[in-house]
Amino acid sequence: MIHHKEKMISPEMVTLDGISYPCYRCNTLVVGTGAAGFNAADTLYSLGQEDVFLLTEGIGMGTSRNTGSDKQTYYKLTLAGDGSDSVQEMAQTLFDGGSMHGDIALVEAAMSARCFFKLVNLGVPFPHNRMGEYVGYKTDHDPRQRATSCGPLTSKYMTEGLERSVMQKDIPIFSGYRVVELVTDGEGTEKKVAGLIAIDAATGEQVLFSATS
């Protein structure tokens, strides 16, 4: 099923290794409609890359929407109180955990507040005080109060807010497709992913998606 209000999206037929496939083309293809997938497509669109598709086995599936715990924690820069914090300090904390490269830790810390307030603006009910400070608490190995939570359904609220934003932008969503193979182009060090093949669950048909990224 293709979710797109403005127009029908029709495939072209292409032949790959002697097999004909219906083919959809776009600049950027995002696989998955959890919080990360919805956010990737939504952010790309907001930054000017509007030729983007979302591909998923099912919009209502996925860990972000369907999992819970006693307290799901969202980690961000400290945004309340009189304690000090900085991008560099948060990046160092992430790096010191031993499972993240330093450059990735720095980017995650630098984008932390921006990404958090995007979710706030989309209606995710993170707790705040009457002065507008988004209060936090300490988690394991955290020297600051960077953690926050909406309770056991935090990631569900995040996914729902991001889904609403994607739907408002009318980004095409191909739902009911299972990815089975990546399609590559080039050889050796020049080899790169050029698309993928997915199974349409409704028909059992193999469908090719061609993308620049």
Predicted regions and their residues:
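Conserved N-terminal/central alpha/beta ligand/cofactor-binding core
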Residues: 2-11, 15-23, 57-202
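Residue-level recognition of conserved structural "scaffold" positions that shape functional pockets
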Residues: 39-41, 69, 76, 211
